[in-house]
Amino acid sequence: MDPKRRALLAAGAAVAAATAVPRVFAGQPAARGTGKFFEKGPVRIYYEEAGSGFPLLLLPGGGLNATIGFFTGNPPFNAIEEFKGEYRCITADLRNAPAGQSTGPVEVDRPWESYADDQLGLMDHLGIDKFMVMGFCLGGPFIWSLLKRAPNRIAGAVLAQPVGWRPEMRDPGYAGAFWKGWPAQISAKRPEVSKQTAEQFVIKMFETDADFVFTVTRDFVRVCQNPILVLPDEVPAHPYAVAMECAMLAPRAEVSVFPWKEPKERIPLAVRQIHSFLRAHRPV
């Protein structure tokens, strides 16, 4: 990484730290938005909206069991409550999340693409062209997929505790291989989806030519001109090294202080930086 770029990234985090002020967080339960369904062919996506302003698509964490409930469960902060005062927040249950209400085909040959279909299809359904996006966990690879497929529609992207590939994930017993339990869960909920089909889906998604952020190459990240903000993590499924590599490679990337979740007093700093980033890049 260019020494000047490393210094700029460090300076950005330092400025955010210096200007941070305490905030009230939505760690406690909050009122949910109004839920609706978006349907396209055999796909049925449950989504909710809250607030008004420039559209902000919020992708919940939770791996393949990502649902809107993530935001009122035990996240670092409740992004819906935090941003609905300035943005039209839109979020949805992931297709075929066992605990969610979204359903659709298990597309073995195009797993990542099928999720991008849902995310962009929901924006189309709502009549939204340009939007910003913030994703937790598996939302990181989803965002890179969206940036590759529809770069002109995304004004800015925030990747919080993003998923990334590490060689240890080849070990079936590794804690970071979060997708291993999904086939049994989804086939139990939907008997028409065989466990074999579900296993083929996750193998294609996470184990076939797996590398980096799963959905794009390093060469793509090097030329991506969309503004991004990375909030790294360091747990088995969220490798710090991959998150930082994205921040170093992407020409218009910023990065938060790390660690930003511990001690808890640092979370307001991270949220303040997200607010500043979104305001800086949303269209006037």
List the predicted regions and their residue ranges.
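N-terminal secretory signal peptides
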Residues: M1-P3
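N-terminal export signals
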Residues: A7-A26
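Conserved HGGG/HGGXW glycine-rich cap/lid loop of the alpha/beta-hydrolase fold
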Residues: V43-Q101
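Conserved acidic catalytic loop of the alpha/beta-hydrolase fold
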Residues: S114-K130
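Conserved hydrolase catalytic core segment
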Residues: K130-L159, V163-W165
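Short beta-strand/loop motif that positions the catalytic acidic residue
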Residues: C224, V230-L231
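Conserved alpha/beta-hydrolase "acid-adjacent" motif
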Residues: A237-V242
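Catalytic active-site module of serine/aspartate enzymes centered on a nucleophile-bearing elbow/loop
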Residues: S256-V284
